[in-house]
C-alpha cells in the first residue's frame, strides 16, 4: 500500500492530488490548489513550500511525483514555473520523500491514452478512474493525473521486472 502525492506546479496556482494505491486499486484521498498571493516571487515560493509541507504532514505520503517543466514561449514564465517546481521539490526532499518527474505527455498518456489530450479529457478520466462524484478543478485534476501516472509507471516497472526474472517451460512470462 502506498500513498502518492502528485503536484502540478505553478507560480500562481499549484495543484495537488493524493491517492492511495493497493494492488490495482487507486483510492482518492484528497486534492486541491495552493493559490499564491501578491507579486513578490520569493513570498510565492514560500507559500508553495509551506502549502506542500502542510499537505505532506496531513497525508503522510510515501512517494512524491511532479510534472516536469515544459518549454514555454515566454522565458520568464518558464523560469517562474521552474522555481515553483523547486519549492515543491524541496518540501518533498525535506520530508525525505523520493521524487519522480513526468512530462505532460507521459501524464496524459497514462490517464487518457494519448499525450495530446485536452484538460477536459484529463478531468473526465480522473473522475472516472478515481470514482469521484464530480470532475475536480483543472489544476487538481492535473495533479491527480501526475499521481496516477506515477502509480501506473511503477506498476509497469514491477510487471516488467517480474517477467524478466520468471522463466517457465523455456519462455519468459
Curated annotation (Swiss-Prot):
A Pfam family: RuvC
Catalytic activity: Endonucleolytic cleavage at a junction such as a reciprocal single-stranded crossover between two homologous DNA duplexes (Holliday junction)
Annotated Mg(2+) 1 binding sites: 8, 139
Active-site residue numbers: 8, 67, 139
Record's keyword annotation contains Cell wall biogenesis/degradation: no
Co-factor binding comment: Binds 2 Mg(2+) ion per subunit.
Top-level EC class as recorded in UniProt: hydrolase
InterPro entries documented for this protein: RNaseH-like_sf, RNaseH_sf, X-over_junc_endoDNase_Mg_BS, X-over_junc_endoDNase_RuvC
Entry EC number(s): 3.1.21.10
Subunit-structure text: Homodimer which binds Holliday junction (HJ) DNA. The HJ becomes 2-fold symmetrical on binding to RuvC with unstacked arms; it has a different conformation from HJ DNA in complex with RuvA. In the full resolvosome a probable DNA-RuvA(4)-RuvB(12)-RuvC(2) complex forms which resolves the HJ.
NCBIfam families: ruvC
HAMAP family according to UniProt: RuvC
Record's protein name: Crossover junction endodeoxyribonuclease RuvC
Highest classification ranks of the organism: Bacteria, Pseudomonadati, Pseudomonadota, Gammaproteobacteria, Alteromonadales
Amino acid at each position: 500500500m502506498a500513498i502518492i502525492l502528485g503536484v502540478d506546479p505553478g507560480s500562481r496556482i499549484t495543484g495537488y492530488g493524493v491517492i492511495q494505491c493497493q494492488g490495482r486499486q487507486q483510492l482518492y484521498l484528497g486534492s486541491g490548489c495552493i493559490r499564491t498571493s501578491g507579486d513578490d516571487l520569493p513570498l510565492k515560493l514560500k507559500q508553495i513550500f509551506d502549502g506542500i509541507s502542510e499537505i505532506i504532514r496531513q497525508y503522510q505520503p510515501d512517494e512524491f511525483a511532479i510534472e516536469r517543466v515544459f518549454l514555454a514561449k515566454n522565458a520568464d514564465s518558464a523560469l517562474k514555473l521552474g522555481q515553483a517546481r523547486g519549492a515543491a521539490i524541496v518540501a518533498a526532499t525535506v520530508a525525505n520523500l523520493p521524487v519522480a518527474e513526468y512530462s505532460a505527455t507521459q501524464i496524459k498518456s497514462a490517464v487518457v491514452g494519448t499525450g495530446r489530450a485536452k484538460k477536459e479529457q484529463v478531468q473526465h478520466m480522473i473522475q472516472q478512474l478515481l470514482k469521484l462524484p464530480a470532475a475536480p478543478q483543472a489544476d487538481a485534476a492535473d495533479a491527480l493525473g501526475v499521481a496516477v501516472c506515477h502509480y501506473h509507471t511503477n506498476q509497469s516497472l514491477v510487471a516488467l521486472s517480474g517477467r524478466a526474472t520468471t522463466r517457465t517451460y523455456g519462455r519468459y512470462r
